[in-house]
Amino acid sequence: VRTRLYLRGRVTSQDFAYEDLAAGLREHPDAVAWLDLLEPSAADLATVAADYGLHPLAIEDALAEHERPKLDRYPDHLFVNVYAVSVPSAEEKPRKVEISAFVTKRVLITVHKDKGDVDLLTERWDRETDAALATSGGIDFLLYGLFDVVVDSQYAAARTIDESMDSIEDAMLGEGGAPRSVRLRGFAVRRTLAQLRRAVAPMEDVVAQMLRPDGDLVDDSLRPYYRDVEDHAERALESIEHSLTRVNELLDADLAEQSNVLNDVTRKLAAWAAIIAVPTALTGYFGQNLPYPGYQQRWGFVESTVLIVVAGGALYFYLKKRGWL
């Protein structure tokens, strides 16, 4: 459990016991609080739910795994589910940290099953230098910091993949089609993008719901900041979709190149088969089984057998080298 008490955007106390949270809010009527729970049990969340009036369906979503990113409205609070992500490389599976948040009037309660890097969130709140943003100091200020950290991680992951696309393109557009290892690399990138898209795609709508004209969830002074996060979420999704379209086009181009190579090989083999078929047909039709050196001799049989094996082996290695086998 991690706790913080904020007054006008500044920390007044932190890392105090959960039992002292309510007292701190009573002592400072204008303060808001952050409560962070790592891998809480159902009993832990039931206690928090009873203290802060959290809806049972929201508690159920917080305990479940792999919930889609969303923002749900309940009579006394909001429930938000988002994913902070990181991508070590374009071919590796993205690392996703699922974060659930209960947003009450004076307390932001975050729940996550993976330790992740919560320090990024606290650092984001602590380094805020904009006076208008910091002095607003409400729950919308804390939620803005959470959204900003999450969307920044998603945009950074999208940029990592986008920057690696040139090398993937160069590797896949070789003459004759990409080698199997490069093709598998392309499939790995597509899988990474698909997984990343599931985490990023709903974020623009999640942030936009906070800015609905019919709601008073965000202070007017904070609306430009939320719109900035919304814009970053849109750009992250556009980057992912652009990379996904690009890698799909590369895989399609590679498949077309392989088809062209196969057609060329088939044409050459058909041409050689036609050339060989003419003398074979004529000699077969006229029954021209002529004596050859060593005919009816033991050494002649050995010689012809060796010739067949050598010629067949040479043809096999030639075709193997050309990539036809």
Map each language-model feature to its residues.
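Peripheral, non-transmembrane regulatory/ligand-interaction domains of membrane transport proteins
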Residues: V1-D219, Y225-D228, H232-H242, W324-L325
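Hydrophobic alpha-helical transmembrane segments and their immediately adjacent juxtamembrane loops
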Residues: G53, D231-L325
